[in-house]
From Swiss-Prot:
InterPro entries: F-box-assoc_dom_typ3, F-box-assoc_interact_dom, F-box-like_dom_sf, F-box_dom. Pfam families: F-box, FBA_3. PANTHER family: BNAA05G37150D PROTEIN-RELATED, F-BOX ASSOCIATED UBIQUITINATION EFFECTOR FAMILY PROTEIN-RELATED. This is Putative F-box protein At1g20657. Residues 56-103 form the F-box domain. It comes from Arabidopsis thaliana (Mouse-ear cress).
Length: 422
């Protein structure tokens, strides 16, 4: 028995007598106990003898405790354990285990970065910052950029092309969301003809273990998403990404043929698959006309919109404006205007930035659109009227390439059943 060292006290499961000194020893002991708790017929001969020799030097951990410990390990460790055997993979792909893993992962979210380069897309993750100290990023996934829409898991490096949408219409727009009640991921797809309204709506449920397939749903609210030009893939690019908050997917849409000004916000209840909309507030901008473009964000659990605040008749920043939805039924919004402190005001004016979102403490987070000699995040605290710059290390090879940052990334290990036809 190994004494002292790292203790799993944070689990509330082991006393000091189970302390271990090395993560590799922990992983190996879990492997041994996983093998002892489940019968693996393919492990025979010399493999079994080797395992028995190691078992003599280790104490048995109850199987329930082994599973509990596994939920606290990195995704790469889970991927390694899945390869031990078919039965082991079945156990770790079980919905109870994957849901427990996702719940724990959600309590310790990370930062996620993506960088497209030379026809490939690279994903990096990093711990969330506690101060202005530099953060190291870790490469998780590298994959080819393809023309078909797909869902990818940056944690495991897996990706799944979506099945072909059954439609004769030429324009297709999709959004991705999560239902926390039924614990299901869904893709909402809307199709339209070149000059028509988005009249077809289809949903794909992801992660149920069943074959991926589209099914049509009813929409009684005439609308279409606010999209602009086409990407190289041939798909229209939404002016704003959709955002999912507490089981509701929000995206900008033209409701009832309203073509004037800033579009309304469409709401899609992922569980019940019902549509509604929230009227825009007076003063919301569709396009700021400057480097910093408007963005839908999650602000302390509420749908909100960030935009550059520009003075009348000017194209220069006077600050940042935050719109927060207070009452969806009454379409009531609150507006907050923040004047940035110098010299940050000038730096933000001169650098092409994008809004990343707001942190759980209410800080407004921005990042450069492209990686230069350094890459960083800016955290603006409205209460202190101060900006903290957090350097991100490990992305130097992507200088001059586009970058995208995401807050509150939770690792997930759900595996869908592949489609038969793509």
């Amino acid at each position: 028995m190994v004494k002292t060292g790292y203790v799993w006290s944070s689990l509330g499961l082991l006393n000091n007598e189970y302390a271990l000194t090395d993560a590799d020893i922990v992983h190996r002991k879990i492997e041994l106990d996983l093998l002892k708790c489940i019968d693996f017929p393919e492990f025979t001969g010399s493999v079994v003898k080797a395992l028995k020799r190691e078992e003599k030097n280790s104490e048995t951990i109850p199987f329930d405790l082994v599973i509990e410990i596994l939920t606290r390990l990195p995704v790469k460790s889970i991927a390694r354990f899945r390869c031990l055997s078919k039965l082991c993979a079945s156990t770790l792909n079980n919905s109870d285990f994957t849901e427990s893993f996702f719940t724990i992962s959600s309590s310790r979210p990370k930062l996620l970065f993506t960088c497209p380069k030379d026809g490939e897309t690279f994903f990096f993750s990093s711990p969330k910052p506690r101060d202005s100290s530099p953060l190291a990023s870790y490469e998780n996934l590298k994959g080819r950029t393809i023309s078909k829409p797909l869902i990818c898991n940056p944690s495991t490096g897996e990706s799944w092309p979506l099945p072909r949408v059954k439609t004769n219409r030429t324009i297709i727009t999709s959004y991705f969301g999560y239902d926390p009640i039924n614990k299901e991921f869904k893709v909402l797809c809307m199709t339209k003809s070149k000059f028509g309204v988005f009249g077809e709506h289809q949903v794909l449920t992801f992660g149920t273990g069943k074959e991926l397939s589209w099914r049509k749903i009813k929409c009684d609210m005439a609308h279409y998403p606010d999209v602009v030009d086409y990407e190289a893939s041939g798909y229209p690019r939404p002016l704003y990404d959709g955002i999912c908050i507490n089981g509701v997917l929000y995206y900008l849409g033209r409701v009832h043929d309203d073509l004037d000004g800033f579009p309304d916000i469409v709401c899609f209840d992922i569980k019940f698959e019902k549509f509604s909309y929230i009227k825009k507030a007076n003063g919301m901008k569709r396009n700021s006309g400057v480097n910093l473009q408007p963005t839908l964000v999650n602000h302390k659990g509420k749908i909100a919109k960030l935009q550059a605040n520009i003075g009348p008749g000017s194209i220069r920043y006077t600050g940042i404006q935050l719109w927060v939805l207070e009452d969806a039924e009454k379409h009531q919004w609150s507006s907050y205007i923040y004047v940035l402190p110098p010299p940050w005001k000038n730096i933000i004016e001169e650098t092409k930035l994008r809004f990343v979102g707001t942190s759980d403490t209410g800080d407004i987070v921005l990042s450069p659109c492209n990686i230069s000699n350094s890459f960083y995040l800016l955290y603006y605290n409205p209460e202190r009227n101060a900006i903290t710059r957090v350097e991100i290390q490990g992305v130097e090879a992507f200088k001059s390439h586009k970058s995208y940052a995401f807050l509150d990334y939770a690792e997930n290990i759900v595996k869908p059943k592949p489609t038969r036809k793509l």
